[in-house]
From Swiss-Prot:
This is Small ribosomal subunit protein uS9. The gene is rpsI. One of its GO terms (biological process) is translation. Keywords: Ribonucleoprotein, Ribosomal protein. GO terms for cellular component: cytosolic small ribosomal subunit. Pfam families: Ribosomal_S9. Residues 118-137 have a biased composition (Basic residues).
Amino acid sequence: MQATDSKNKVVYWGTGRRKSAVAAVRLVPGTGAITVNGRDGETHFNRIPTYIQTIKAPLETLGLENEYDIIVKAEGGGLTGQADAVKLGVARALCQLAPENRPPLKSEGYLTRDPRAKERKKYGLHKARKAPQYSKR
């Protein structure tokens, strides 16, 4: 959704989920800075460049990587899940920014929610599928 913040800047919203991570993403016109939970994106993701590249991928597809600041509130999951949740939120916010952004993002797969999640543990098994050792006698 489009809204305005306290400084009358236009803000675009998007929500992303991956595994057990949820990310509420705001896109604000700026210089390309990433802020996650009030901290610098590099600090939050332990300076691992893969996560930063993942987050910026939808912006790079459209050539907007230095035109919008990304402000994120991320909860749950680990760093990989949060990074992928932010990527989905950024892509959804870019679709609200301009409807013509949708086809290139969809063709790259940035608007698809990854449905893979941890399988539940079953009784009688050690983990979701790991069975106790079988003994014939």
